[in-house]
Each structure stands twice: as structure tokens, then as C-alpha cells.
């Protein structure tokens, strides 16, 4: 039952994060859809770590280096997702209020992605690797 509660909590967190992103785009005072480009970063952020977990064996000495490279690449994607709205706001493509809403949405979405890997990352019967 704890897995179902975690899944519902993660779904709620994702919905709240996407709501902040949409508010930063669709409110009549902002009315610019440039911040939707951060959706690409949401999709790209878990990919390096997922690939590293599938390819490496924990007994190998190279596995630690491969996982650290994956975490480094994931960090670059996350920092880019936080930097893009700021660059858009500095270039006057979006308003600073929209930037704040998008950054709030980024925080919630990336916390949800981290929570997913913490909840479903173990190698038990309720693991995401079975999907």
C-alpha cells in the first residue's frame, strides 16, 4: 500500500509542477510560450542515469565512474533547465514573474523526478526496472 501512496504523491507533485509551468506561460499578463522548452529538459534529465544503471555491473570498477558521469550529465541538464528561463527573462522574451513561476515548476518537477528514483530505485519487487 505504501507504493500506491508514493505513486499518487508523485503524480500530484508532477501535476503541481506542470501547473506552475503552464501558469508561467498562459496567464494573460505573460502570454508567452517560450518557457515550454524546459519540457525537453524534463524528458532528458533521467536518461543518463537510466542508461548507466542498465549498462554497468556493480562489481566492476568502471561502474562507479560511469554512474558519476551519468550524474554529472544529469546535473548539466538540470542546471540548464533552471538557466533557460533566466536567460529568456534577461533577453526580455518572458517577464520575470513568468520566470519565477517556471523556476518554481522546475523545482517541483525535479523534486518529483528525484522522488521517483528514490522510491522506485531499489531492487525489490516494486522497482521501476520492471517497467
Swiss-Prot record:
Residue ranges of the TM segments: 7-27, 32-52, 69-89, 100-120
GO cellular component, as recorded: endosome; membrane
Entry-linked InterPro entries: Vps55/LEPROT
Alphabetized UniProt keyword annotations: Membrane, Transmembrane, Transmembrane helix
Bilayer topology: Multi-pass membrane protein
Superkingdom per UniProt: Eukaryota
Pfam families in the record: Vps55 (PF04133)
Biological processes annotated in GO: late endosome to vacuole transport via multivesicular body sorting pathway; negative regulation of growth hormone receptor signaling pathway
Location (main, coarse): membrane
Oligomeric form and interacting partners: Interacts with RAB13.
Assigned protein family: Belongs to the OB-RGRP/VPS55 family.
Function: Negatively regulates growth hormone (GH) receptor cell surface expression in liver. May play a role in liver resistance to GH during periods of reduced nutrient availability.
Protein's name in the database: Leptin receptor overlapping transcript-like 1
Gene name in the database record: Leprotl1
Amino acid at each position: 500500500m505504501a507504493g500506491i501512496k508514493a505513486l499518487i504523491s508523485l503524480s500530484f507533485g508532477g501535476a503541481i509542477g506542470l501547473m506552475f509551468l503552464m501558469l508561467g506561460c498562459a496567464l494573460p499578463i505573460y502570454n508567452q510560450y517560450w518557457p515550454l522548452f524546459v519540457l525537453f529538459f524534463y524528458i532528458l534529465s533521467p536518461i543518463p542515469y537510466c542508461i548507466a544503471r542498465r549498462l554497468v555491473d556493480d562489481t566492476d570498477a568502471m561502474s562507479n565512474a560511469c554512474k558519476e558521469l551519468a550524474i554529472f550529465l544529469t546535473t548539466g541538464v538540470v542546471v540548464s533547465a533552471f538557466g533557460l528561463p533566466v536567460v529568456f527573462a534577461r533577453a526580455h522574451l518572458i517577464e520575470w514573474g513568468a520566470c519565477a513561476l517556471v523556476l518554481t515548476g522546475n523545482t517541483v518537477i525535479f523534486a518529483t523526478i528525484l522522488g521517483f528514483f528514490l522510491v522506485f530505485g531499489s531492487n525489490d519487487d516494486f522497482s521501476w526496472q520492471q517497467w
